[in-house]
Amino acid sequence: MRKGKPARKLGRTAAHRRATLNNLSTQLILHKRIETTEAKAKETRKVIEKMITKARKGTVHAQRDIFKDIRDKKAIRILFEEVVAKVGARNGGYTRVIKLAPRLGDAAKMAIIEFVDYSEAISPAASQKSSKQDRAKRVQGSKKNVDAVAESAE
C-alpha cells in the first residue's frame, strides 16, 4: 500500500533543503515575520516549532542542539530570551501561516509565517495609521508656515 510523503522536497537536494529551512527559521526568529512561498512556510513551521519546544527546556544541551541548525548567536539569544518568554505557557502552535495572493512573476502561492504572540507588535495597520496622522500634521503645519511666510512678505 502506498504511503503519503512525509515532507515537501521543495525542488532541492536534502542538504540544500535543510539549509533553506534553517535560514528561514533564523530569519523568522530575527524578524518575527517573513514572507515566503506557502510550501516553504509550512515546512519552516515544522522546523521552528520543534526548535521552540526544545528551547523551552532552557538547558545548555538544548542551546547546543539548536545551534547545530541555527548558526547565528544573536538568533539563539533572541530565541531563548524573548521568544520563549512570550510563548512559554503555550503548548505548541507557536506560529501561524497566513496565505497571500499569488506572486506576480510566476503565480507561486505566497504566505506569511509569523509568531502568534508577536502579531500585535508588528501589525502593519497600526503603523500605517500613525504615518497618515503624521502626514496630516505635517501638511497642516506646512500650510500654516506658508501663510506666515506670505504675511511676512507683505
From Swiss-Prot:
GO terms for molecular function: structural constituent of ribosome. Belongs to the bacterial ribosomal protein bL17 family. GO terms for biological process: translation. It comes from Chlorobium chlorochromatii (strain CaD3). It comes from the Bacteria. The gene is rplQ. Keywords: Ribonucleoprotein, Ribosomal protein. Part of the 50S ribosomal subunit. Contacts protein L32. HAMAP family: Ribosomal_bL17. This is Large ribosomal subunit protein bL17. Disulfide bonds: none annotated. One of its GO terms (cellular component) is cytosolic large ribosomal subunit. InterPro entries: Ribosomal_bL17, Ribosomal_bL17_CS, Ribosomal_bL17_sf.
